[in-house]
Protein backbone atom coordinates (compact mmCIF):
# COMPACT_ATOMS: atom_id res chain seq x y z
CA UNK A 1 0.00 0.00 0.00
CA UNK A 2 2.77 2.57 0.76
CA UNK A 3 4.17 1.92 -2.74
CA UNK A 4 0.78 2.80 -4.24
CA UNK A 5 0.15 5.88 -2.10
CA UNK A 6 3.62 7.32 -1.44
CA UNK A 7 2.73 7.47 2.26
CA UNK A 8 4.56 5.95 5.21
CA UNK A 9 3.57 2.38 6.13
CA UNK A 10 1.38 1.70 9.12
CA UNK A 11 3.54 1.77 12.25
CA UNK A 12 3.49 2.36 15.97
CA UNK A 13 0.20 2.03 17.84
CA UNK A 14 -2.02 1.44 14.77
CA UNK A 15 0.20 -1.48 13.73
CA UNK A 16 0.24 -2.81 17.29
CA UNK A 17 -3.56 -2.60 17.33
CA UNK A 18 -3.79 -4.69 14.15
CA UNK A 19 -1.43 -7.30 15.60
CA UNK A 20 -3.35 -7.39 18.88
CA UNK A 21 -6.69 -7.85 17.13
CA UNK A 22 -5.25 -10.64 14.98
CA UNK A 23 -3.93 -12.43 18.08
CA UNK A 24 -7.26 -11.91 19.83
CA UNK A 25 -8.98 -13.56 16.88
CA UNK A 26 -6.78 -16.62 17.18
CA UNK A 27 -7.52 -16.87 20.90
CA UNK A 28 -11.25 -16.32 20.36
CA UNK A 29 -11.47 -19.20 17.90
CA UNK A 30 -9.45 -21.45 20.21
CA UNK A 31 -11.84 -20.72 23.09
CA UNK A 32 -15.05 -20.42 21.06
CA UNK A 33 -16.65 -23.22 23.08
CA UNK A 34 -16.33 -21.02 26.17
CA UNK A 35 -17.20 -17.57 24.78
CA UNK A 36 -19.74 -18.67 22.15
CA UNK A 37 -19.48 -18.83 18.39
CA UNK A 38 -20.95 -15.35 17.76
CA UNK A 39 -18.43 -13.62 20.02
CA UNK A 40 -15.61 -15.68 18.52
CA UNK A 41 -16.71 -14.79 14.99
CA UNK A 42 -16.95 -11.08 15.79
CA UNK A 43 -13.47 -10.95 17.30
CA UNK A 44 -12.00 -13.07 14.53
CA UNK A 45 -13.57 -10.99 11.75
CA UNK A 46 -12.54 -7.70 13.34
CA UNK A 47 -8.99 -8.03 12.00
CA UNK A 48 -9.98 -8.08 8.32
CA UNK A 49 -12.51 -5.31 8.93
CA UNK A 50 -9.73 -3.13 10.36
CA UNK A 51 -7.45 -4.05 7.45
CA UNK A 52 -10.14 -2.90 5.02
CA UNK A 53 -10.52 0.36 6.94
CA UNK A 54 -6.77 0.98 7.12
CA UNK A 55 -6.13 0.18 3.46
CA UNK A 56 -9.09 2.28 2.33
CA UNK A 57 -7.98 5.24 4.44
CA UNK A 58 -4.42 5.12 3.10
CA UNK A 59 -5.50 4.80 -0.53
CA UNK A 60 -7.95 7.69 -0.25
CA UNK A 61 -5.46 9.86 1.67
CA UNK A 62 -2.85 9.13 -0.99
CA UNK A 63 -5.34 10.06 -3.74
CA UNK A 64 -4.73 6.76 -5.49
CA UNK A 65 -8.35 5.70 -5.79
CA UNK A 66 -7.74 3.40 -8.77
CA UNK A 67 -6.35 0.88 -6.27
CA UNK A 68 -9.54 0.88 -4.19
CA UNK A 69 -10.52 -2.29 -6.07
CA UNK A 70 -8.13 -4.18 -3.82
CA UNK A 71 -10.74 -3.65 -1.08
CA UNK A 72 -13.19 -5.78 -3.05
CA UNK A 73 -10.97 -8.84 -2.63
CA UNK A 74 -10.11 -8.12 1.01
CA UNK A 75 -13.84 -7.61 1.59
CA UNK A 76 -14.55 -10.97 -0.04
CA UNK A 77 -12.01 -12.57 2.29
CA UNK A 78 -13.82 -10.97 5.23
CA UNK A 79 -17.14 -12.30 3.90
CA UNK A 80 -15.59 -15.76 3.52
CA UNK A 81 -14.57 -15.65 7.16
CA UNK A 82 -18.15 -14.79 8.16
CA UNK A 83 -19.44 -17.68 6.02
CA UNK A 84 -16.87 -19.98 7.64
CA UNK A 85 -18.15 -19.23 11.16
CA UNK A 86 -21.84 -19.39 10.26
CA UNK A 87 -21.45 -22.61 8.26
CA UNK A 88 -19.31 -24.26 10.94
CA UNK A 89 -21.93 -23.52 13.59
CA UNK A 90 -25.06 -24.51 11.68
CA UNK A 91 -23.69 -27.28 9.43
CA UNK A 92 -20.95 -28.71 11.63
CA UNK A 93 -18.32 -28.09 8.93
CA UNK A 94 -17.17 -25.17 6.79
CA UNK A 95 -16.67 -26.67 3.33
CA UNK A 96 -18.00 -23.68 1.40
CA UNK A 97 -16.39 -21.16 3.73
CA UNK A 98 -12.96 -22.77 3.38
CA UNK A 99 -13.17 -22.84 -0.41
CA UNK A 100 -14.46 -19.25 -0.44
CA UNK A 101 -11.51 -18.16 1.71
CA UNK A 102 -8.96 -19.90 -0.51
CA UNK A 103 -10.58 -18.42 -3.62
CA UNK A 104 -10.54 -14.87 -2.21
CA UNK A 105 -6.91 -15.18 -1.12
CA UNK A 106 -5.94 -16.62 -4.49
CA UNK A 107 -7.64 -13.69 -6.21
CA UNK A 108 -5.43 -11.35 -4.16
CA UNK A 109 -2.35 -13.32 -5.25
CA UNK A 110 -3.40 -13.02 -8.89
CA UNK A 111 -4.15 -9.30 -8.63
CA UNK A 112 -1.15 -8.16 -6.58
CA UNK A 113 1.20 -10.78 -8.04
CA UNK A 114 0.32 -9.58 -11.51
CA UNK A 115 1.78 -6.20 -10.62
CA UNK A 116 4.74 -6.99 -8.38
CA UNK A 117 6.14 -10.00 -10.26
CA UNK A 118 6.64 -8.25 -13.62
CA UNK A 119 7.70 -5.08 -11.78
CA UNK A 120 10.42 -6.74 -9.69
CA UNK A 121 11.45 -8.86 -12.67
CA UNK A 122 11.84 -5.83 -14.91
CA UNK A 123 13.94 -4.01 -12.31
CA UNK A 124 16.23 -7.03 -12.02
CA UNK A 125 16.53 -7.70 -15.76
CA UNK A 126 17.21 -4.08 -16.69
CA UNK A 127 20.42 -4.32 -14.66
CA UNK A 128 21.45 -7.42 -16.61
CA UNK A 129 21.39 -5.76 -20.03
CA UNK A 130 19.55 -6.52 -23.25
CA UNK A 131 16.95 -9.26 -23.48
CA UNK A 132 13.26 -9.99 -23.18
CA UNK A 133 11.45 -8.00 -20.50
CA UNK A 134 8.15 -8.89 -18.81
CA UNK A 135 4.89 -7.50 -20.14
CA UNK A 136 3.37 -5.25 -17.51
CA UNK A 137 -0.27 -5.28 -16.39
CA UNK A 138 -2.64 -4.70 -19.33
CA UNK A 139 -6.10 -5.70 -20.58
CA UNK A 140 -5.14 -9.35 -20.93
CA UNK A 141 -4.33 -9.48 -17.22
CA UNK A 142 -7.73 -8.00 -16.43
CA UNK A 143 -9.41 -10.58 -18.67
CA UNK A 144 -7.39 -13.38 -17.05
CA UNK A 145 -8.36 -12.29 -13.54
CA UNK A 146 -12.03 -11.91 -14.49
CA UNK A 147 -12.09 -15.36 -16.11
CA UNK A 148 -10.28 -16.89 -13.16
CA UNK A 149 -12.67 -15.26 -10.69
CA UNK A 150 -15.63 -16.73 -12.61
CA UNK A 151 -14.06 -20.19 -12.50
CA UNK A 152 -13.29 -19.81 -8.79
CA UNK A 153 -16.89 -18.83 -8.05
CA UNK A 154 -18.02 -22.04 -9.73
CA UNK A 155 -15.41 -24.02 -7.80
CA UNK A 156 -16.65 -22.64 -4.48
CA UNK A 157 -20.24 -23.66 -5.25
CA UNK A 158 -19.85 -26.87 -7.30
CA UNK A 159 -16.22 -28.03 -7.51
CA UNK A 160 -17.02 -31.33 -9.24
CA UNK A 161 -19.39 -29.99 -11.92
CA UNK A 162 -18.14 -30.68 -15.46
CA UNK A 163 -18.82 -27.18 -16.77
CA UNK A 164 -16.96 -25.76 -13.78
CA UNK A 165 -14.15 -28.18 -14.60
CA UNK A 166 -13.86 -26.76 -18.12
CA UNK A 167 -13.85 -23.20 -16.76
CA UNK A 168 -11.10 -24.10 -14.30
CA UNK A 169 -8.92 -25.72 -16.98
CA UNK A 170 -9.43 -22.69 -19.24
CA UNK A 171 -8.43 -20.39 -16.37
CA UNK A 172 -5.36 -22.54 -15.80
CA UNK A 173 -4.28 -22.15 -19.43
CA UNK A 174 -4.83 -18.38 -19.24
CA UNK A 175 -2.67 -18.15 -16.13
CA UNK A 176 0.08 -20.32 -17.66
CA UNK A 177 0.18 -17.90 -20.59
CA UNK A 178 0.09 -14.92 -18.24
CA UNK A 179 3.08 -16.26 -16.31
CA UNK A 180 5.00 -16.97 -19.53
CA UNK A 181 4.75 -13.26 -20.44
CA UNK A 182 6.83 -12.27 -17.39
CA UNK A 183 10.24 -13.55 -18.60
CA UNK A 184 10.73 -15.82 -15.62
CA UNK A 185 13.24 -17.96 -17.55
CA UNK A 186 15.71 -15.06 -17.31
CA UNK A 187 15.62 -14.85 -13.50
CA UNK A 188 17.57 -18.00 -12.62
CA UNK A 189 20.49 -15.86 -11.47
CA UNK A 190 18.57 -14.43 -8.51
CA UNK A 191 16.42 -16.68 -6.33
CA UNK A 192 14.72 -13.65 -4.78
CA UNK A 193 13.07 -12.97 -8.15
CA UNK A 194 12.80 -16.55 -9.41
CA UNK A 195 10.79 -17.64 -6.37
CA UNK A 196 8.01 -15.19 -7.32
CA UNK A 197 7.59 -16.94 -10.67
CA UNK A 198 7.72 -20.39 -9.07
CA UNK A 199 5.08 -19.34 -6.54
CA UNK A 200 2.77 -18.10 -9.28
CA UNK A 201 3.27 -21.34 -11.21
CA UNK A 202 1.13 -23.04 -8.57
CA UNK A 203 -1.81 -20.82 -9.58
CA UNK A 204 -2.37 -22.40 -13.02
CA UNK A 205 -1.33 -25.80 -11.68
CA UNK A 206 -4.09 -25.57 -9.07
CA UNK A 207 -6.64 -24.53 -11.70
CA UNK A 208 -5.80 -27.47 -13.95
CA UNK A 209 -5.78 -30.02 -11.11
CA UNK A 210 -9.08 -28.64 -9.78
CA UNK A 211 -10.60 -28.72 -13.27
CA UNK A 212 -9.62 -32.34 -13.80
CA UNK A 213 -11.57 -33.36 -10.68
CA UNK A 214 -14.80 -33.39 -12.71
CA UNK A 215 -13.31 -35.58 -15.43
CA UNK A 216 -10.82 -37.88 -13.69
CA UNK A 217 -10.12 -39.56 -10.36
CA UNK A 218 -7.91 -36.68 -9.20
CA UNK A 219 -9.09 -35.68 -5.70
CA UNK A 220 -10.27 -32.18 -4.88
CA UNK A 221 -7.48 -31.80 -2.34
CA UNK A 222 -4.75 -31.86 -5.02
CA UNK A 223 -5.74 -28.55 -6.55
CA UNK A 224 -6.68 -27.11 -3.17
CA UNK A 225 -3.19 -27.70 -1.81
CA UNK A 226 -1.53 -26.48 -5.01
CA UNK A 227 -3.23 -23.17 -4.26
CA UNK A 228 -3.05 -23.10 -0.46
CA UNK A 229 0.43 -24.49 0.16
CA UNK A 230 1.93 -23.64 -3.23
CA UNK A 231 0.56 -20.36 -4.58
CA UNK A 232 -0.40 -18.77 -1.27
CA UNK A 233 2.24 -20.30 1.01
CA UNK A 234 5.22 -19.92 -1.31
CA UNK A 235 4.18 -16.41 -2.41
CA UNK A 236 3.79 -15.38 1.23
CA UNK A 237 7.34 -16.41 2.08
CA UNK A 238 8.67 -14.92 -1.17
CA UNK A 239 7.23 -11.51 -0.31
CA UNK A 240 8.10 -11.79 3.40
CA UNK A 241 11.77 -12.46 2.68
CA UNK A 242 12.06 -9.69 0.10
CA UNK A 243 10.29 -7.16 2.32
CA UNK A 244 12.34 -8.18 5.36
CA UNK A 245 15.62 -7.70 3.50
CA UNK A 246 14.49 -4.22 2.50
CA UNK A 247 13.13 -3.27 5.93
CA UNK A 248 16.37 -4.30 7.63
CA UNK A 249 18.60 -2.42 5.18
CA UNK A 250 20.14 -5.51 3.59
CA UNK A 251 20.92 -6.05 -0.07
CA UNK A 252 18.06 -7.48 -2.13
CA UNK A 253 19.81 -10.79 -2.71
CA UNK A 254 18.84 -14.28 -1.59
CA UNK A 255 21.77 -15.79 0.27
CA UNK A 256 22.14 -19.46 1.08
CA UNK A 257 19.87 -19.21 4.12
CA UNK A 258 17.04 -17.62 2.16
CA UNK A 259 17.52 -20.13 -0.65
CA UNK A 260 17.18 -22.93 1.91
CA UNK A 261 13.89 -21.38 3.09
CA UNK A 262 12.63 -21.38 -0.50
CA UNK A 263 13.72 -24.97 -1.06
CA UNK A 264 11.89 -26.09 2.09
CA UNK A 265 8.59 -24.40 1.25
CA UNK A 266 8.72 -25.66 -2.35
CA UNK A 267 9.33 -29.18 -1.04
CA UNK A 268 6.36 -28.79 1.31
CA UNK A 269 4.11 -27.74 -1.56
CA UNK A 270 5.25 -30.55 -3.86
CA UNK A 271 4.96 -33.20 -1.13
CA UNK A 272 1.47 -32.04 -0.13
CA UNK A 273 0.22 -32.16 -3.73
CA UNK A 274 1.71 -35.60 -4.38
CA UNK A 275 0.26 -36.87 -1.09
CA UNK A 276 -3.18 -36.22 -2.61
CA UNK A 277 -2.26 -37.73 -5.98
CA UNK A 278 -0.53 -40.84 -4.57
CA UNK A 279 -2.51 -41.94 -1.50
CA UNK A 280 -0.36 -45.05 -1.09
CA UNK A 281 2.52 -42.71 -0.18
CA UNK A 282 0.43 -40.19 1.72
CA UNK A 283 1.71 -41.14 5.20
CA UNK A 284 5.33 -40.41 4.27
CA UNK A 285 4.55 -37.42 2.05
CA UNK A 286 2.34 -35.74 4.63
CA UNK A 287 5.13 -35.93 7.19
CA UNK A 288 7.62 -34.59 4.64
CA UNK A 289 5.26 -31.72 3.82
CA UNK A 290 4.65 -30.88 7.48
CA UNK A 291 8.35 -30.99 8.37
CA UNK A 292 9.40 -28.91 5.35
CA UNK A 293 6.63 -26.36 5.96
CA UNK A 294 7.63 -25.91 9.61
CA UNK A 295 11.30 -25.76 8.63
CA UNK A 296 10.64 -23.00 6.08
CA UNK A 297 8.82 -20.70 8.50
CA UNK A 298 11.12 -21.46 11.43
CA UNK A 299 13.99 -20.76 9.05
CA UNK A 300 12.48 -17.38 8.26
CA UNK A 301 12.17 -16.64 11.98
CA UNK A 302 15.81 -17.60 12.55
CA UNK A 303 17.04 -15.61 9.56
CA UNK A 304 15.06 -12.41 10.09
CA UNK A 305 13.57 -12.40 13.60
CA UNK A 306 16.52 -10.72 15.28
CA UNK A 307 17.11 -8.21 12.49
CA UNK A 308 13.45 -7.16 12.42
CA UNK A 309 13.54 -6.45 16.17
CA UNK A 310 16.68 -4.30 15.90
CA UNK A 311 16.92 -0.77 14.45
CA UNK A 312 17.25 -0.66 10.67
CA UNK A 313 20.77 -0.63 9.26
CA UNK A 314 21.86 2.75 7.96
What are these regions (language model features)?
Residues 1-314:
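Hydrophobic alpha-helical transmembrane segments of multi-pass integral membrane proteins
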Amino acid sequence: VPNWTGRLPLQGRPLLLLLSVWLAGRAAVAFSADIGWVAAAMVDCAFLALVCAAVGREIIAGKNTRNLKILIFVGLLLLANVVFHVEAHFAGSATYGRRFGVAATLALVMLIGGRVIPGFTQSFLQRRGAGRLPITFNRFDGFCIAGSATALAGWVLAPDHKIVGLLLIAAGLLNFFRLARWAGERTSGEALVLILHLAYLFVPLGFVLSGLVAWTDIPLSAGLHAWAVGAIGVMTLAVMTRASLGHTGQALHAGKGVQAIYAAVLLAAAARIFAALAPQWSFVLLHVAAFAWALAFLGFLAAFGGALLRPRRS
